[in-house]
């Protein structure tokens, strides 16, 4: 998937929690999403990929976990992300890049694993973020992959980022507690220390690099230089997303005036602690206050179409997976979720330790149905795109008021762990659904006064 990932260590976040977020993006046509819980009895014992027919038995005693699969399962599950009942989170995947030197040595495995499979075969079987890396690495070395991907794992203490490097090679790195990462669709890890306790990698990776003379740098190992790309497409499709977010959070240290820069850093440090609301902003961003904003009223059409925004029509869902410490384990995992294009939606803080999810998020169908949140938010975004400047104030008021109501209910729930979290999630869903419906209604009423098919006549 052509996604964008954002990671925040526990000392870099406003409330001291680990946060891993990703926009799951698709093609230009809608690809409806569901929000479900997979309980142990519903987890397959034998897995078979629809894309490649790769198959094998899965371990016994899986954990329950949240996920956001496609409504149309004919192409596979595509579980995307979730939090398991041990409060370990995973998001997979960020489609990335490679180069011909690597594929000539370690080609893709057409019968291997890919984004369709990773979450389903990993998340129910791990007790920590580090275990997630180890299981994923073992699967990659055994079965291989048919694409280049990045994925994140988190628990209450750690965040790990893993990238595939060809068909079987891979490397992972622990994100420092005081750091953040913005990862577009390129190979993202840069400087890498093979001797560090904060790195894990495939068997013989350093020897593979040295033996095949793959390192272009005189000193050190930069995995992006070795395994990644540096193309014209990167300058317009990938690098600008990292550029905008780094200028937003750390202009003093990583900010610059070049959105096409091929060597933007991987590990970054913000000039303030990062909130959920700010994550929502950057994951919805379209280069606001720059000439590259497609909704700009002052820049040229060429500038507005030059680079790929983070928030766009292809957003299927945004998840922010939060693992909290110093709170009852039952309440610790929060699966923040927003469906559809991020320009006109809101994140909802669903509790992850549940056995079911709200129907307006769970029962999404492939056909249009505005009573389901995915279709309602998508419809709102389509209308909003027709006159963004005319609707943006209504959007901002909706976002402020909706988040305040959701946070108020969350704050009350956090005080009492012995309650039905399924019922709380239903209340959260209804707050969001009502607010989204009201926003759409206000936009329709306002927009009707500005239709081209009109004629002013006093009678």
From Swiss-Prot:
InterPro entries: C69_dipept_A-like, Peptidase_C69. Disulfide bonds: none annotated. Keywords: Dipeptidase, Hydrolase, Protease. It catalyses: an L-aminoacyl-L-amino acid + H2O = 2 an L-alpha-amino acid. GO terms for molecular function: cysteine-type exopeptidase activity; dipeptidase activity. Its EC number is 3.4.13.19. One of its GO terms (biological process) is proteolysis. Pfam families: Peptidase_C69. The active site is at 3. NCBIfam families: C69_fam_dipept. Belongs to the peptidase C69 family. This is Probable dipeptidase A. It comes from Lactococcus lactis subsp. lactis (strain IL1403).
